[in-house]
Amino acid sequence: MSPLGRGERCRSQFAVNRTTELDSDLPSMRFFRFIPGLCAVLWLFAVGAGIRILARYESTPGNRGPAPVLWPSETTLRRDSTRATLVMVLHPRCPCSRASLGELAELMAQSQDLVSTTVLFYQPAGFQEGWAKTDLWRRAGAIPGVSRIIDLNGREARRFGGVTSGQTSLYDEHGRLLFQGGITRSRGHEGDNPGRSALVSWVTKRAAAVSVTSVFGCPVFDPASETDNQLYTCKLPR
């Protein structure tokens, strides 16, 4: 065979081999082209799942212990005999409860002279008094007309059925229960809500369409929160 013929044959064989190699690479090339789209789909799925989990967390109420229908005789708290008395139970390290205090501030701005208000700050036994004096303690102290009490071991909270941070009870001047529940629309969210609206109506008009609402906040009696750590993540009720 002439050199020219051998050259043509080599070129033909090279072309065939190259085509075969390209054909064998096609599946992997197609796979790699799908990777960006697959990653985008997985990312969107993860974001959607995260949003659903967050929405469920924010909208799931805590447990609500029943408040006594009459002012508890064993309590050391003073009931006002000339106007309504409000008692709010707070876990001092519950971040959700900032919203509860924000709503309480709105209530007091509208009806401070019509209601006597006390906020109980839970403190487990074995810790110094400063354990409960967090930013929530300071926020409550900045609301005109609000008294603060350190509730050692949650004795008073239990007397009023308070098991979730933010739980609020309202009694009239005769010691009869008018309202019990939370005053936020979800965990950590301020804004118009049935609880605050009902309280304002009860305090100003002595009548309301709502007397019980859900409470959104951390469990008051949670052993996991009883540490010196200033950070406490709100948990869903068990």
Task: Describe the residue ranges of each PLM region.
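Hydrophobic membrane-insertion alpha-helices, especially the h-region
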Residues: P36-R52
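A short beta-strand-turn-helix
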Residues: P66-A84, E103-E106
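Short, internal strand/loop/helix patches
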Residues: L136-Y171, L177-L178
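Short, thiol/selenol-centered motifs that function as redox-active sites or metal-ligating centers
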Residues: H91-L101, A125-E129, T168, F216-R238
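Short active-site neighborhood of thiol/selenol oxidoreductases, capturing the structured segment around
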Residues: D80-L104, L199
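Thiol-/selenol-based redox modules, centered on thioredoxin-like
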Residues: L178, G182-R238
